Each structure stands twice: as C-alpha cells, then as structure tokens.
Design a protein with these regions (language model features):
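Mobile, glycine-rich extracellular loop/lid and propeptide segments
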Residues: 359-362
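N-terminal accessory/cap region of cofactor-dependent oxidoreductases and related radical enzymes
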Residues: 23-345, 349, 365-507, 511, ...
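Cleavable N-terminal signal peptides of Sec/SRP-targeted secreted and luminal proteins
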Residues: 1-24
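Short linear, low-complexity motifs centered on an aromatic residue
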Residues: 535-554
Length: 693
C-alpha cells in the first residue's frame, strides 16, 4: 500500500475560521443538517490519508478496466452525441492525408465525431435539478452554498514553489486546454453582452427581467475581500447548450457545446474552420500571416480589439490567432507566437529542400508536422509528469518504441469529456504564479510582472527583450505546487482591467461545473474504483481533516460535494501531480484523444501516416527545442524545459539540444541525384530526456 503524504504550503487560521463560520454570520454559512458536525472523527494517524492506488498503475494486469475506457456506442453517456450544431451538413469525406480544420471526417465511420461546435461527451449522467438543464441543488433540496464562499474558505493563497517543475509546465497545460476545448457562448474574460448583475455589482438583476442564460455568482455579505468594496454579484453567463440552440427538443438533458475541435490538433494556431484557417494564412510559401516588427514575427493585429483585449490605446498589440484566448496572459501569448513561428520555420525549411512544392503543399505539410510535434511534446514530455510515467505506459498513452504504435480504434469516441474539461483538467489552476519573473541569458532574474496587470494586454511581450526573457522565465521560475492553494491574482484580481478587484477563477470553475450539471465527487469516486463516502468522515481517506471539516460546514450532505472541489482537495498520487479521481479522468481523456484520432502521429494508419523515419524525427523534438528554434535570441536551454535547472538538467547551448531533421521529407523527383544530400542525424537521442527513471 502506498502512503500519501501531503505537506501544506502554510498553516491556516482554522480555529479562527471555525469560530467565524459556526455562528453562521461572517461567511453566511448554512448550518449543516443531517451530516454536518463540528465533532467529526477521523482515522488514526496510522491510517489517515493512506490509500492503495495500485489500480491506477497496472492493478488490473496492466490493462484498463473495461468500464474505464468504454468504446463508442453511439448513444448514452459513454461516448456523447458527437454532432455539429443541429446536425449541420458536412462535406463528403475523402481519405486525404491532411486533417480537416473543423475535425470532421477524422472518423470515416462517424464523420461528426469531434467536430467543432458539437457537444462535450460525458462519463456520468448530469445532475440537473429539473432533469433537463437547471443547475444542481443539494440532495436535501436546499440551494448549494455560493461558489465564491466555497472558494474563499477552501482555496486560500499560500506561496510554495514547486521543488521540481517550471512554470512552463502549467502554461503548456493551458495551450493543450485551449487546443481541445472552448465552452461556446463564453467570452473568456471580456465583458459579456449579457449582463446578469447591476452595473455597480451590488446585486443580481431580478430573475424575471434578466436573460435566462444568466447564472450570477452570489457574494456573501461578509466576504473577506469583495464585500468591503460593496460587490455582491459576480457576472456569469451559462455555456451554450443543445437546448438553447434548438438541437434538443427539451425532452432529454442538456449537453454543452465546445466551439473548437475536440482533437489535439493545434486548432489554437490554425482555427477550427476553413474560413478561420484561411484568415490566418499568407498564401505564399506555406506561411501563416505575420506582422514583422524589428525583424521579429508576431501574429497580425486583431481588427476587433475590444472583443478580446483590454488595451489602453489603439497602438497596443492585440493579436489574431486561431484562438480567441491567445491574448489572455503574457506567457500564454508567448507560447502561441512560438507555435506560429514554428509553423513558418517548418514551411521555410520544407521550401528549401522541396523548391517544387506549391504554397498549399508547403502549408499542409508544415501544419501536419507542427501538430505532430505538439502531440509528441504533450504525450512524451507533459503527460508523464502530470499522470506519472508508469501510468501513461500501462494505459497506452506512451510507448518506448521506434516503431509505429498501430493503436487507432475507430470505435473510440475522441470527444472531450465534460467531466475532464469542466473539472479534472482545471487542476493546474493551483500551479499558476501571481508574478511572472523575467530572466536574461545568464538566467538572472531582474524583474517580475504582476499577472493581473497584463490580463488581455499582450503589449508587454513586444517591449525590449521581454519576449525572450518571458520565454526563459517560464522555463526557469518554479510553478506553484499542486495543492489546495490558489494565488489571489486569480481569486481576487482575475481580469480586473485596472480596477481594484476583479473576479475569482476558482469560484468560476465551481459555477461552471454547476452550469454543466456535473455529477458529484462521490459519484466520480465510485466510477474510478474508490469507495463511496457515506459520511463526511469517509472523505478523510484522501482529504486532510481540516478540509473535511470545512466541507461539512459548506455542504449539507456528502453527495453534494462537487467534483471540482473534492478532486482539488485530494492527496497527490505519488509520481503524479494530481489526486486519484482527477488522475482517473485525465488518463481516460488522453487515451481517447490518442486512440480515437486517425491522424495521431504515431499510429501508422494507411493514407494519413508519416513514414517511420519521419515519426522518429518528430520524436526527437522537445519543448526546449521549440524555444531554441523560435525565440528571438535564446542561445541556451536546459534539455528538459518543464523541469527546473539542476546538475542533472543543466543549461546547455541550443546546439546540443537534439533537433528533428526534415531530410525524411525531401521529395526526390525522377532524374535527381541523391549523393550530395545531407545525411539525417542519427537516432542516438530518440527519447533522450522524457523517459528518465
């Protein structure tokens, strides 16, 4: 049995907090009913916080339990509907070698699977209070506690840098998220045209006069932060669902819609439609459109700045990319630009070795390679850190091979799971740092940017050497530890746009899960093979007693505890960065994302596959190589960029970071000689850095 030990970042004034909440005044606490007690009993120190997680690391003989990765059945919750809005028509499928932009025709037997503007999948049935789309209530019939109140009590701030991983690990997680999911109808940090609160935020608009999509977050009278500013209401608009779009007659539960493709296909770079992709192309040399500034490539300006940026003047940068969220924070924008530059670098190199290729061929081949590189970094660098290498190997997410994997399964639904996108994959919000440090070429930090000063304001990255110094910075600065603590930059000041206070991302996460009707934490425990909690004390197998005590005051019943809340409080499984239920759901999602994608770079599917030589070159890429090749003037990197610099991971010249060769893409036309061709680099370093044990 593995014993899990969680070391808190800092102590909390829990006795003081309880004295406040027990009166039911300071935070507007309800008095818990049948299951609430201030005298909860916890296991002894010998058994507390210990659990056997062998099932997550091959406890079933190295095979996934049948219930854990169900095949697509075309109906029910295991698989999801997988259709475009109101079954809009799609073009006939052909077995071409390139992906469509909207995700259609990836699965030739069910061409709508994973398309943009289709519903999320689900593992567990929704728990809408009316069975259709009304947000959940307690199993006792009471309203659930305010999402802001839960955030303030359970998820305070306490700074504790991660001892091993860099801030780039968290930031690349946001790139993956934006690639695979975008809740339709949300504005991602910009003011929504639908207003749910009074202009002064002192109250919610009356229900009989406000838009039905409104679901504002109530702020208690004695909130420790917002009440002092007179703020009693936080704006929140529900995600577009199939009922609101007229695709569901209202006789079955609503399913929320994702506006982007469900595949890991760099839609954040290229867009999720033909029109969107064309708007981002130069149509020369296979390149994406850029604006050159002092010889540096940046995305073209967004002509609708007010919709996506909080700029102070029209001269400030605001970029057009494949994703509306690209300007959200400086380090996210840096990664978006690195991906754009990588595409253009690939297109230029392909044009050099294949001068006879036209613009379309160069663009599509560069796009195909860039997507494959993104998949390789995600699966072979990023996921083994998050989920544990043993787990990714045993569950078919990673392979230590120089062959094809031949693991495409057309009966697996690749749709992004609501359970994943709306809860489990928001785990890394705890890893966000409130200040972004800039590092020069010598890895000396000379300045830190306050995160909330730069939400939706990317201008800072164009100034001086900030682009490189932010790129180095996130590969040098530790991320915050994986635990129950969240920086106030996102729980007090999110999207504040110059105001003294902003919004609360943790409260928004909780409210979004309610909006989507996610099942309870207890149900996900059962689904993942953990025992159901019949009392609050039963949660103490995975959650510390202090947090369990708070849960008993915040919720009326153990079945009320929400997945995004309970999962965020769990002890971290050794060798991973998440607790067991999040581990279960994220593993399931990325299994589906891989084996349900006919174009996944390793699977060897006829007509869509790379050659084996090309695949092995792609495997040589890394996040550090992305920086070396595409930053302005970064000359050195540590080989494992998601890992902090150490004696085992020293900073080395970029020339020593393995680089894929594009020689396997050289197309030899009839009559050409090959004797003078450069030789492809050897494969001595085919998994050099990601598989250290």
């Amino acid at each position: 049995m593995l014993r899990l030990i969680l070391v808190n970042k800092a102590g909390i004034g829990f006795l003081c907090l309880l004295s406040s909440v027990s009166s039911g005044q300071d935070y507007g606490f309800h008095q818990p009913s049948d299951f609430g007690s201030s005298k909860l009993r916890f296991p002894s120190s010998q058994s507390y916080y210990g659990a056997d997680f062998s099932g997550f690391f091959g406890g079933h003989g190295g095979r996934r339990p049948a219930h854990q990765f169900p095949s697509f059945s075309g109906s029910g919750y295991f698989g999801g509907p997988g259709f475009g809005i109101c079954d809009s028509p799609i073009a006939p499928c052909t077995q071409g070698k390139y992906r469509t932009y909207d995700g259609s025709c990836n699965n030739l037997g069910n061409p709508r699977l994973g398309v943009a503007n289709s519903p999320y999948g689900r593992l567990l049935p929704p728990k809408y209070s009316d069975g259709l789309q009304a947000p959940p209530v307690s199993v006792t019939g009471h309203n659930l506690t305010s999402a802001r109140q839960i955030s303030a009590i359970l998820f305070p701030d306490a700074k504790a840098p991660d001892p091993k991983w860099t801030l780039a690990l968290m930031q690349y997680g946001q790139i993956i998220t934006h690639d695979m999911s975008l809740a339709a109808g949300t504005t991602q940090g910009k003011a929504h045209t639908t207003m749910c609160c009074t202009p002064d935020l002192r109250a919610a608009l009356p229900e009989d006069t406000r838009n039905p999509a409104c679901f504002p977050i109530d702020i208690p009278d004695h909130d420790p932060v917002f009440s002092e500013a007179g703020i009693r209401c936080m704006e929140f608009v529900r995600t577009t669902n199939d009922i609101s779009q007229g695709c569901n007659s209202g006789n079955k539960a609503a399913e929320q819609i994702s506006a982007v493709t469900h595949y890991l296909d760099s839609s954040n770079v290229y867009g999720s439609s033909q029109q969107g992709a064309d708007a981002r192309r130069e149509f020369q040399g296979g390149r994406l459109s850029v604006e050159l500034k002092h010889g540096r490539q940046f995305p073209p300006p967004n002509n609708n700045k007010s919709a996506v940026c909080d700029h102070l003047s029209e001269e400030e940068a605001c970029y057009l990319t494949g994703d509306i969220r690209a300007n959200q924070n400086p380090q996210l924008t840096v990664f978006q630009i690195l991906q754009l530059r990588e595409h253009n670098r690939l297109a230029g190199e392909l044009a050099r070795i294949n001068p006879h290729w036209d613009d379309e061929r160069l663009y599509q081949e560069a796009r195909k390679i860039a997507i494959a590189e993104h998949q390789a970094v995600t699966y072979y660098e990023w996921l083994p850190i998050i989920l544990g290498r043993e787990n990714t190997d045993r569950n078919g997410l990673t392979y230590n091979t120089q062959d094809f994997t031949y693991d495409y399964k057309e009966n697996v639904d690749p749709s992004v799971l609501n359970d994943h996108a709306t809860a489990a994959f928001r785990f890394f919000h705890t890893n966000i740092a409130g200040f972004l440090r800039l590092f020069d070429e010598h890895r000396s930090s000379y300045e830190a940017l306050r995160l909330s000063d730069h939400f939706n304001r990317p201008q800072i990255i164009e100034e001086g050497n900030n682009f490189d110094d932010l790129a180095r910075g996130m590969h040098t600065q530790p991320q915050e530890s994986s635990d129950k603590f969240f920086t106030t930059e996102i729980t007090w000041f999110l999207f504040r746009n110059g105001r003294s206070l902003g919004q609360d991302l943790r409260a928004i996460d909780i409210q979004r899960a309610r909006d989507h009707g996610l099942a309870s934490y207890n149900h996900y425990r059962e689904y993942c093979g953990l025992p159901k909690a019949h009392s609050f004390e039963d949660f103490a197998d995975l959650i510390d007693p202090e947090s369990v005590q708070k849960l008993s005051y915040l919720y009326h019943h153990p079945d009320d505890v929400e997945f995004t809340v309970g999962g965020s409080l769990e002890a971290i499984v050794p060798g991973t960065l998440v607790g067991p239920t999040f581990l279960c759901i994220i593993t399931e999602q990325f299994y589906r994302t891989r084996v349900g994608d006919r174009f996944f770079f390793e699977n060897g599917v006829k007509d869509t596959s790379f050659t084996l030589e090309q695949v092995n070159e792609i495997r040589r890429g890394s996040i550090s190589r992305l920086i070396c090749d595409n930053a302005d003037d970064v000359k050195s990197m540590q080989p494992r960029g998601f890992e902090q610099i150490s004696q085992d991971n020293p900073v080395v010249p970029c020339s020593l970071i393995p680089a894929p060769s594009l020689e396997p893409w050289r197309e030899i036309r009839q009559g050409e000689h090959t004797a003078s061709q450069p030789q492809a680099v050897d494969h001595e370093f085919t998994f050099p850095f990601f598989f250290k044990k």
